[in-house]
Regions:
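Conserved catalytic core of the tyrosine transesterase superfamily
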Residues: 13, 58, 78-79
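A short hydrophobic/small-residue beta-strand
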Residues: 59-60, 105
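Class I SAM-dependent methyltransferase SAM/SAH-binding core
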Residues: 1-23, 29, 43-47
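Short conserved AdoMet
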Residues: 5, 40, 54, 103
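A short glycine-rich, Lys/Arg-flanked "PGG" loop and its adjoining helix->strand segment in the class I
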Residues: 43-58
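Conserved Class I S-adenosyl-L-methionine
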Residues: 104-173
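A short SAM/SAH-binding and catalytic strip from SAM-dependent methyltransferases
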Residues: 28-43, 63
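Short, glycine-/aromatic-enriched active-site segment of Class I SAM-dependent methyltransferases
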Residues: 66-85, 92-111, 128-129
Length: 173
């Protein structure tokens, strides 16, 4: 076959990061975008990534850092609620995990983004779009109207002079 049809398709795997269905030293490149922070044991993932990468392989990943959603955490506390935001890992801790897993001289960086919203409803809808709640010990049942209203009021109190609510996102690379 000629043209694009002659290209091999990439191997895609859907699996637990910590138990990849791949042979040791079988990958030239591992790419993970904004997913690592969902795994409860990122140190285990780093060991697994080191196992499947070839000696000269490249690991590229991004994950949310600990300053992500700081304003939302503060609003939860102000509303008298227990925050249901993941405890994101610091970039230095990721670097340490990489060294412990056998990676040589990892290069880490981070970037802080500031997203603004016109309303607390818009902000909360965006946060919900990031996925579910992985906390095993979270409160059973739904958040009541009064508690949800208190959270929205606490977010609305954070509005800047332009009437917008900020939400910080720290991306670790």
């Amino acid at each position: 076959r000629a043209g694009l049809g002659a290209l091999e398709l990439p191997y895609l795997a859907c699996a637990d990061f910590g138990r990849l269905p791949l042979a040791a030293s079988s990958m030239d490149l591992l790419w993970s975008n904004l997913a690592l922070h969902w795994h409860p044991q990122p140190h285990r993932v780093m060991r697994e990534w080191a196992r499947v990468l070839r000696a000269d392989g490249l690991l590229m990943f991004s994950a949310f850092g600990p300053d992500t959603f700081a304003e939302l955490r503060a609003a939860y506390v102000k509303a008298g609620l227990v925050p249901t935001v993941l405890p994101f890992v610091d970039l230095h801790d990721y670097g340490d995990m990489m060294v412990e897993a056998g990676f040589a001289d990892p290069v880490m960086d981070m970037e802080k983004l500031n997203i603004t919203y016109s309303s607390s409803d818009e902000l909360l809808a965006d946060v919900r779009s990031f996925g579910g709640n992985p906390f095993v010990e979270r409160k059973a049942g739904l958040t009541g109207r009064a508690a949800f209203g208190a959270l929205k009021r606490a977010l609305d109190e954070q509005k800047a002079a332009d009437g917008r609510i900020s939400l910080s996102v720290e991306v670790v690379y």
